[in-house]
Design a protein with these regions (language model features):
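A conserved regulatory-domain signal marking ACT and ACT-like small-molecule sensing domains
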Residues: 1-122
């Protein structure tokens, strides 16, 4: 299945991430999962949240550089090796993973990922 992910571009300076989190808190938007990928000058803070459209509008309205996109969400049994099994299938099908992160939800492992071939991934 796919879910909407918010990508927030934040400067690598103290307080920038706090501003984003405070805006989401004030809007009563719950974070479900998040990850940060950084470069020298900025980071990309990716989140899965309770209300992605409202989160996008809230952050955009505050002048924050933000994007919304569909990513894949795969629910797995929370046992060793399940992520490897899932990635193996994608690899065998010639599908490359652009990025991936995971979290636990109600005792299940959830993989969030983007691929180089969304149509084939479906």
């Amino acid at each position: 299945m796919t879910v909407q992910q918010i990508s927030i571009f934040v400067e690598n300076k103290q307080g920038t991430l706090l501003k984003v989190l405070e805006l989401l808190k004030e809007a009563n938007i719950q974070l479900v999962a998040s990850t940060i990928a950084d470069t020298v000058e900025y980071g990309i803070y990716r989140i899965i949240c309770s209300e992605p459209q409202r989160a996008f509008a809230t952050l955009k309205g505050a002048g924050i550089s933000v994007a919304i996109s569909d990513v894949f969400a795969l629910t797995l049994d929370n046992v060793p090796g399940r992520a490897a099994d899932a990635v193996r299938i994608l690899t065998q099908e010639g599908i490359g993973i652009t990025y991936m992160y995971s979290f636990l939800y109600e005792g299940k492992g959830i993989l969030i990922f983007r691929t180089d071939n969304p149509d084939k991934t479906r």
